[in-house]
Design a protein with these regions (language model features):
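Conserved Class I SAM-dependent methyltransferase catalytic core
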Residues: 21, 120-183, 196-198
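Short, flexible helix-coil linker/hinge segments at the edges of structured domains or between repeats
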Residues: 101-123, 128, 166-170, 192-193, ...
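S-adenosyl-L-methionine
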Residues: 1-30
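Phosphate/oxyanion-binding active-site loops and adjacent basic polyanion-contact surfaces
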Residues: 10-18, 65, 128-135
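C-terminal substrate-recognition regions of SAM-dependent nucleic acid methyltransferases
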Residues: 4, 8, 184-317, 321, ...
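Conserved proline-anchored active-site loop of SAM-dependent methyltransferases
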Residues: 21-22, 36-50, 74-116, 133-142, ...
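Conserved S-adenosyl-L-methionine
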Residues: 53-58
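Adenosine-cofactor binding site in Rossmann-like domains, unifying the SAM/SAH pocket
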Residues: 60-79
Length: 376
């Protein structure tokens, strides 16, 4: 099958990482060895091996890839009557530009386990949804009782601010404690930013979100569970709290920039402005109308995210890598303000590189630009 790994969302967690994640889980949640466990997409079986190494033997597993098991089975076909004390593993991840890697409702119209039994109303209205989200939703229906837990490796993008809101809201119906763990190691055979999320009910941590980033030292932050829709990426929080993302002086750009969509000329092939030359566009020529110049900030790309330039909306053609901003009415003819903002953004490109941690290329939100502070 072409692109089989990406279509099936297969990213197999290294065994040494599995041991670390199991240690973390059992340090927070105590279970005896007789509990019933499900690994819903066991892949190469590293989580099952790790559990058996700790003498947890009552384990069921699902794996859809017939090349990895003699008895392939689809987790979405598993009867909801099967209940577990612990669901753990590494669900598949959807690749954003690969339709086949997403969960499609049409594939399960004839299923004995009708998706309406585990999907939210919002997900039922969608043609496709990220498969990791559907794994979470169905897993919630397999927990045995309030003492049950889920521990899944997830793309770090799951915890981006205001993303996956319906899934997060559903999680809160079952669990009052969330632990999000990330470290500086590579967990798969490729570097995919990810985390280990534990959903549980732990009395001493009721209504708490524990965010952990480990880089030889374990750095921990605690939030109220009401913050579930905020940005909860451990590495980003660590960077903010330890000075790697320092931007605490000045005035937020939202005081200078309009919150409007700006139309510009775009072309993938026939453009004269791209991330490779945007830094050259830091001045407004003396013979040009200042009001025609807008701020262009690169929104995506590991090496380019955060670069800024001044583009002429009458003359320039851009590729699709930019957010475009215009200043408020009182600044539209102010050349100095525009050039100063551009200069100060470019002096702190690392700020934007460190504030983001996504699956694939680094990317920023418009909100990150509006919150950036400048001294004018």
């Amino acid at each position: 099958m072409e692109n089989k790994q990406e279509i099936l969302g297969q990213y197999f967690t290294k065994i040494e990482i599995v041991h670390q994640l199991l240690y973390l889980l059992f340090s927070y949640k105590k279970y005896d060895n007789k509990i019933k466990i499900l690994e819903p997409s066991f892949g190469t079986g590293n989580f099952i091996k790790g559990l058996k190494g700790k003498n947890y033997l009552n384990i069921d597993g699902c794996e859809i890839d017939k090349n990895l098991t003699k008895n392939p089975c689809d987790f979405f076909e598993m009867p909801l009557t099967k209940k577990y004390d612990l669901l753990i593993g590494n669900p598949p991840f959807s690749k954003y530009n690969l339709k086949e890697s997403y969960f499609s409702l049409t594939n399960y119209f004839k299923s004995a386990v009708w998706p309406s039994l585990y999907l939210t109303k919002k997900e039922l209205k969608k043609d496709k949804e990220k498969i990791e989200n559907i794994f979470i939703l169905k897993s919630l229906k397999h927990i045995k009782d309030e003492s049950s837990s889920i521990g899944y490796v997830l793309p770090i993008s799951f915890f981006i601010k205001n993303k996956n809101k319906s899934v997060k809201d559903e999680i809160l119906k079952y669990f009052s404690t969330i632990i999000i763990y990330q470290n500086d190691k590579i967990w798969f055979d490729r570097n995919i930013p990810c985390c280990f999320a534990i959903f549980a009910n732990i009395n001493k941590l009721k209504n708490k979100i524990i965010v952990i980033y480990e880089n030889s030292i374990k750095n921990e932050e605690v939030f109220n569970i009401k913050n579930i829709h905020e940005e909860l990426i451990p590495q980003v929080i660590f960077h903010k709290n330890n000075g790697y993302i320092k931007n605490d002086k000045g005035i937020p750009l939202e005081e200078f920039l309009e919150n409007k969509n700006i139309k510009v000329k775009k072309s993938y092939r026939e453009n004269n402005i791209s991330a490779s030359n945007i830094l050259e566009k830091n001045k407004i020529p003396a013979n040009k109308l200042v009001e025609n110049y807008k701020l262009a900030v690169v929104r995506v790309g590991n090496a380019s995210v955060g670069k800024c330039g001044l583009i002429n909306i009458k003359d320039d053609i851009l590729n699709d890598m930019f957010y475009i901003f215009d200043v408020k009415d009182q600044y539209k003819k102010n050349k100095q303000i525009k050039e100063t903002i551009c200069q100060q953004i470019n002096q702190k490109i690392d700020y934007f590189r460190n504030i983001t941690c996504r699956v694939g290329s680094k990317s920023i939100k418009k909100e990150d630009v509006y919150n950036f502070k400048v001294i004018i």
